[in-house]
Amino acid sequence: ALGGGLEVALGCDYRVALDSARLGLPEVKLGLLPGAGGTQRLPRLVGAQKALEMVVGGNPVKAKEALSLGLVDEMVSGDLLDGALAYTRQLLADNAPLRKLRDLAVSDAQDGLFDQFEQSIARKQRGFKAPFSCIKAVRAAVELPFDKGVERERELFFELLVSPESAAQRHVFFAEREVAKVPGPVSYTHLRAHETSRY
């Protein structure tokens, strides 16, 4: 589950993933930040430090790491639906409580964490707005109530959406995808040089 898929999953009480799954929020690579409350729920689940690494870096984690972080609650092999249904039956049998991430506090948000993280990426990310907006969004998860944090996330998202940096990053991303669709290699072996006269 990448991007929107993980954001939807974070809105659920429990999450089940295949053992081959990769989970992440790569929007920063498009000059954006995760939406739908992703920057607000993720820190409440995995802690501020790991959320910063995932949101600002945009790199996914494998299912095994996601399980150890608490990002997913169950990892299955084989058929995902069968595994998810079996886990759901177990939760019901155990009378497991509903869990709303919005109600959790963010752990491990020690003083100076955000400033230190910003300094650590300053040189490498110079000229890019999205990584710094991602830091602001995760910081909002720590400092603001959930609903206010989601509002701040939305404001930051729309600022990035209309920025020239994001437009350029999205253009490059989609251009690279289109290049891959060119049918077959182009051959110029059938062309021959011809002498031409001037005028």
Predicted regions and their residues:
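Glycine-rich beta-to-alpha active-site loop
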Residues: 1-30, 34, 62, 197
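Amphipathic alpha-helical segments at domain termini/boundaries
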Residues: 7-11, 54-156, 174-175, 180-188
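Conserved structured core elements
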Residues: 33-36, 45, 65, 78, ...
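Hydrophobic, secondary-structure "cap" segments at the distal end of domains
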Residues: 39-49
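Glycine-centered loop/turn positions within well-structured domains
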Residues: 40, 52, 198
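Long amphipathic alpha-helix in the N-terminal Rossmann-like dinucleotide-binding domain
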Residues: 89, 155-168
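Conserved small/polar residues in nucleotide/adenosyl-binding loops
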Residues: 189-196
